Amino acid sequence: MAVSPKINRREHILQCLAQMLETSPGQRITTAKLASEVGVSEAALYRHFPSKARMFEGLIEFIEESLLSRINIIMDDEKDTMKRCQLVLQLLLIFAERNPGISRVLNGDALLGENERLRSRISTLFAKIETQLKQILREKTLREGKGFNLDEAILANLLLAFAEGRIAQFVRSEFKLKPTQHFDEQWRFIQHQLLQS
């Protein structure tokens, strides 16, 4: 029973951190400001997280778990190459749109001036997603007997760059320019180009 309040407090701290990232774009979040937002002392924050870097790691763990587990579901449920790519990109964009504060972590904006390992973890997450896209594209040859004229690694990088660009626009516009805006039309164009290659 004693564990539950601690878990809830940790979650509450992370939710407040994400909320502050959303409502204070471009501003650095200090532990003093976060403690005030949570309604506890800085010492109480440090009872749950030994450092601010660990708080950001908690958000990154949430991001990794949310995205990678859903990508695995897409891989299991959908077999069509283009539909898989579409769903992975759509997942990234919808996730960022529904979690504006966390999109600043995805974009790296919230991690400026923070511990290098945090930026490294986000880079690793995007590398995993790019690898997943590359695998999806390579499986097209195995499944359909026809590949692409361009290397799958180059195409996977292009697809991920598209999603990262949309997330960057979202952050830069202070969450006004939605990442999913015009996605259906853009995807139709991208898909057409991919199928031509």
Swiss-Prot record:
This is Nucleoid occlusion factor SlmA. GO terms for cellular component: bacterial nucleoid; cytoplasm. Belongs to the nucleoid occlusion factor SlmA family. It comes from the Bacteria. InterPro entries: Homeodomain-like_sf, HTH-type_Tx_Regulator, HTH_TetR, NO_SlmA, SlmA-like_C, Tet_transcr_reg_TetR-rel_C_sf. Pfam families: SlmA-like_C (PF22276), TetR_N (PF00440). GO terms for molecular function: DNA-binding transcription factor activity; transcription cis-regulatory region binding. Residues 30-49 bind DNA. It is found in: Cytoplasm, Nucleoid. One of its GO terms (biological process) is cell division. Its main location: cytoplasm. PANTHER family: ACREF/ENVCD OPERON REPRESSOR-RELATED, ACREF_ENVCD OPERON REPRESSOR-RELATED. Keywords: Cell cycle, Cell division, Cytoplasm, DNA-binding. Residues 7-67 form the HTH tetR-type domain. Homodimer. Interacts with FtsZ. Required for nucleoid occlusion (NO) phenomenon, which prevents Z-ring formation and cell division over the nucleoid. Acts as a DNA-associated cell division inhibitor that binds simultaneously chromosomal DNA and FtsZ, and disrupts the assembly of FtsZ polymers. SlmA-DNA-binding sequences (SBS) are dispersed on non-Ter regions of the chromosome, preventing FtsZ polymerization at these regions. It comes from Shewanella oneidensis (strain ATCC 700550 / JCM 31522 / CIP 106686 / LMG 19005 / NCIMB 14063 / MR-1).
